[in-house]
Amino acid sequence: MRFSDNLAKILDKYENLGNTLSSGIMGDEFVKASKEYAELEDVVAKIKEYNKAKSELEEANNFKLEVGLDNATLEMIEDEIYTLENSLPKLERAVKIALLPKDDADSKSAIIEVRAGSGGEEAALFAAVLFNMYQRYAELKGWRFEILAISDTGIGGYKEASASIKGKDVFSKLKFESGVHRVQRVPETESQGRIHTSAATVAVLPEAEEVDIKIEDKDLRIDTYRASGAGGQHVNTTDSAVRITHIPTGITVALQDEKSQHKNKAKALKILRARIYEEERRKKEQERADSRRGQVGSGDRSERIRTYNFPQGRVSDHRINLTLYKIDEVVKNGQLDEFVEALIADDEAKKLLEI
């Protein structure tokens, strides 16, 4: 089917859905039609803009052929033709991007998990830096950042930390952050001024609702124990810490941040549901023809994706060969948009090649 025929078909479908919604349908039929109609709104707006530019270009070319035009009018028409001819490829690309298959999880909120990797205490300190960077980015975007759990080292580092980030399209923005982040800097305890390299792992999971993942009580094993602080000492006398294991998948989540066992259980279930949902998404995507490996930000947590070099003041993303020499703005102020937008654009470009 030709590109123009495909666009006409989409416009017809949109119009028919609008007529259906106006006909007074109710119940599940109305819900289904409303959902389809809303999903098409963005692409239809882009198609109409593209068709309008094509029509205006055709009119301008026809007008140019008319006899008796003065030089000023002819120059004005040629300027318009030049502008329209330059805008059409961009408008066509915007339509094609809007037509790309959507990741159902893109519109969801997210759970982010940061874990210290190789590098000992320096890695734990870097994990804390990354976690705080994402918190500041969430604040800049107007998202709600709720800390779920932090396992600290007692001197400012995080062995691991997790948070729920709520807002529109959070997962679509943050999903490319999954992977190994490497830091190169001189630790405060380094007397010789030598640069040390350490790493932390980031995992970004779409936050799953109960409607996405149904977890049966019979599939859970819940253990309770006393919470412990740094050094292993018990910090309270009740069994408030919770460990939940999803028996079918073997996925386990342990939480002890809250003094209330009930709150720890609720947070642990939230993380567990997100991990199970992400595992199911991964399996489905691997079954599809589109290999995850062929896309930017595959989400492979063993993939080294970014290096933060403090002595040189640079942050380099290895997937798209983008280096920014403003490490403080990125790390301390959470200004991640240049990386986020570049990764999304690169992902879209690769998908367009597959059409």
Swiss-Prot record:
Record field: compositional bias (Basic and acidic residues): 280-293
Modification after translation, per record: Methylated by PrmC. Methylation increases the termination efficiency of RF1.
Positions bearing N5-methylglutamine: 233
GO terms under cellular component: cytoplasm
Superkingdom classification of source: Bacteria
InterPro entries, A to Z: PCRF, Pep_chain_release_fac_I, Pep_chain_release_fac_I_sf, Prokaryotic/Mito_RF, RF-1
UniProt KW keywords: Cytoplasm, Methylation, Protein biosynthesis
Region feature Disordered, mapped onto this chain: 280-308
One Pfam assignment: PCRF
Predominant localisation class: cytoplasm
Subcellular location: Cytoplasm
GO terms assigned for molecular function: translation release factor activity, codon specific
Entry-linked PROSITE patterns: RF_PROK_I
Function (record text): Peptide chain release factor 1 directs the termination of translation in response to the peptide chain termination codons UAG and UAA.
Family, similarity comment: Belongs to the prokaryotic/mitochondrial release factor family.
Name of the featured protein: Peptide chain release factor 1
Organism of this sequence: Rickettsia peacockii (strain Rustic)
Lineage per the UniProt record: Bacteria, Pseudomonadati, Pseudomonadota, Alphaproteobacteria, Rickettsiales
